[in-house]
Each structure stands twice: as structure tokens, then as C-alpha cells.
Amino acid sequence: MYVPFEDLPEDSKIWIYPSNRKFSDAEITEIENDLKVFTENWSAHGTGLQASYLLRYNRFIILAVNQEVQQATGCSIDSSVAFIQNLEQKFQVDLLDKMDVTFKNGEHIAHKSLIDFKRMAKEKAVTANTIVFNNLVNSIEEFNENWEVPASESWHSRFF
């Protein structure tokens, strides 16, 4: 069952899916509708999950589940991945490529392959102070505190 994101507890589990491109406003409206339907019906072993979503920067899809009410199970996680794969096909984007890095380049959000990001670090086109999106955070609390951080404070630090 859908609940507003801000109503979920801080320890709720999250999954972050960065897009390889910015979504248009029309796409965002459609994605929000799809996410609302998905989270309203998302369940684990027949029990509705208390779930929500966020869209950030017209580029990131964040799914969240209150695991205090009902744990997300393998099958429910599989259904969320299938949902994300459907969005990939529908909008011709990559959302599941974990070998990509998303970071701020001034006011612009850049999305590069890990190889390109390493090269940019070597060439000092990005620095330890570059704001990166740490999409490995696991909870709303971690998301709020450690999602947008300087590269030096994330797994990206190994490149500097």
C-alpha cells in the first residue's frame, strides 16, 4: 500500500535507480503514475508492503519499504526489479547499470561510466570535493545523510 515518503520511518529500506538521462516533465508525470500504481499494489507473500517512492532531479527513482510492517522478500524485490525493467523499456533508459557514476558538475547532473569517471579523476576533471550520488545507501536515514556527498566521503574516494 502506498504511503507518503515522508511518513515512512528512517530505517525503511530503499533502492535507488539512477537514469542515464534526465526525464522530461511529461515522462516524470507518467513515471509518477506508474510508481503510484506499483507501490499501491506491491506485496510480499500476499501482504501489502507499506511502500513509497521519490523522484529526484528528474533522474533518480527511489523506492522505499517500511520493513517494520512487512519485510520485502525475494519475490517482492524481483517484482520491483521487473517493474524497473519495464520502465527501462518504456522510456528507453538504463536504470540498473551499477557500473555508472552520477555526480554534480556545477548545477548539471552528469552520468558517466565508471571507466570514464576514473579517467576524469586522473585528469582532475573531478576531485575529491565533487558531489557524487552514493546510490548504495540502504535506508531513508542513510539517504538523507549520505546520498549527496563529496566523493572523498563515499566509495568513490578510491579514485582520488
What positions do the PLM features span?
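Helix-adjacent hinge/juxtasegments
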Residues: N66-L95
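Terminal interaction module
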Residues: L96-F160
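Short, flexible active-site-proximal loops enriched in glycine and acidic residues
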Residues: Q50-A51, K90-D100
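Ordered hydrophobic segments in well-structured contexts
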Residues: I14-P18, F60-A64, D100-T102
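Short histidine/acidic/glycine/proline-rich micro-motifs that form metal-
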Residues: K22, V69-Q71, K104
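Short, intrinsically disordered low-complexity segments
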Residues: G48-N66, Q70-Q71
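Long, hydrophobic N-terminal alpha-helical segment
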Residues: V3, E10-R56
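Intrinsically disordered, low-complexity boundary segments flanking structured domains
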Residues: M1-E6, Q89-K90
